[in-house]
């Protein structure tokens, strides 16, 4: 009698907690910084006019491109059994100073924690982005859950996640609302300009083979577009004021649809403006929930 085939994600090891990804250095030249802004159709001239005083601004969410380029662990054997059960849960981007056009940024990730939750195993990868002189420019916590998995022992952490701001009052009706059209080619545009390629976002054959209804927009694109909406509504169109972007990914965003970004609360604490937002997909479902943007109040 044949043994029954193993099903489900199985047991997840904590042996890789503390280990690093490759380090990847990227030059933020004008071609790339302009292309990233174009990837999300951000029409702010600050990202495109290289004749303006002070030069080009750099969209904060270029951090997602830097993370993507440095995500590899060539000396780590992948868990092929658990991989299909992994889902991206949330991100927390902390910017200590604006990225500068023309600088070289080196990005490296580290698995900083794994813990058992009721839905499965929760993990946090932390990517540090440093300038050529060693200055820490930004950190990105990239968090996921392997649904149904079991940890092989107690929770392990080499670093904690920073607390997120809390909002004293959230009104029932949105304070403001912005609609963002998602064209037929939005995912291809983001793929090539942001340098983030996964065929479920560009090839219907691959997306449907993976059980999706069609190609879907990258979650990082949805967050970047949402940040642009918040910047334009609450920060006078000045993305250089942004110091933090948090959010949880939820529903899928399809092509030829609309993302609706809604501001739910605003507050200023010790000179920092904080905005709570959400993004809805074309079906009215949350695409980004518990979205938070922080930045200099003026």
Regions found by a protein language model. Give the residues of each.
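HotDog/MaoC-like acyl-thioester-processing domains
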Residues: 2-15, 19, 86-177, 253-256, ...
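Short, structured beta-strand/loop micro-motifs enriched in basic residues and often containing a Trp
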Residues: 84-92, 240-246
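Catalytic-pocket segment enriched in acidic/His residues
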Residues: 201-268, 272, 280-285
